[in-house]
């Protein structure tokens, strides 16, 4: 059969907040957290090899405030579910994070507790050597998305050197 990992995504900051997502797709943080907990309690199967799992998945660093990142990773770890987000996907997004927080994306994620073997990032095309070292040291995963990145004419994550170095 097919294993189904439902990622409960969210966008909680919009353009009115100085973020990138349009305001008409924004949800309230408390609503997202409550719904994520509801999904975990009702549908997540923690058994090894389970067919249905729930994943905590705020969309990206530029689309949710610190409180959401900190509370959502805490919720996920309380229930032992994995967490996922888009990370370092495009130059404009990386520049936005750098200007807003004075840190690169993975450095910011680490500051918020969003690293570890229970976390994986989609894309990760804009990583510098320090970010790669953080990912390796913390056991954080990367989901390479070459087809998606080609549709948007973005870079692809250069996973070959990471795999050769081991620890990824």
What label would you give each PLM region?
Residues 1, 68, 154-158:
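Glycine-rich, charged/polar anion/phosphate-binding loops
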Residues 2-125:
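Metal-coordinating catalytic core of metallo-dependent amide/deamination hydrolases
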Residues 114-168:
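Active-site-adjacent C-terminal substructures of enzyme catalytic domains
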């Amino acid at each position: 059969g097919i294993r189904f990992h439902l990622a409960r995504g969210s966008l909680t900051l919009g353009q009115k907040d100085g973020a990138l997502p349009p305001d008409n797709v924004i949800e309230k943080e408390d609503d997202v957290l409550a719904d994520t907990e509801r999904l975990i309690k009702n549908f997540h199967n923690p058994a090894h090899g389970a067919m249905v799992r729930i994943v905590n998945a705020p969309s990206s660093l530029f689309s949710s405030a610190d409180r959401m990142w900190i509370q959502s990773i805490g919720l996920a770890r309380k229930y032992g579910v994995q967490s996922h987000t888009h990370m370092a996907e495009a130059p404009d997004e990386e520049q936005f994070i750098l200007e807003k927080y004075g840190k690169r994306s993975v450095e910011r994620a680490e500051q918020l507790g969003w690293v570890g073997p229970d976390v994986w990032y989609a894309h990760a095309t804009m990583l510098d050597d320090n970010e790669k070292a953080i990912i390796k040291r913390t056991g954080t995963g990367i989901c390479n998305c070459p087809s998606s990145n080609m549709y948007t004419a973005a870079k692809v994550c250069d996973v070959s050197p990471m795999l050769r170095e081991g620890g990824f």
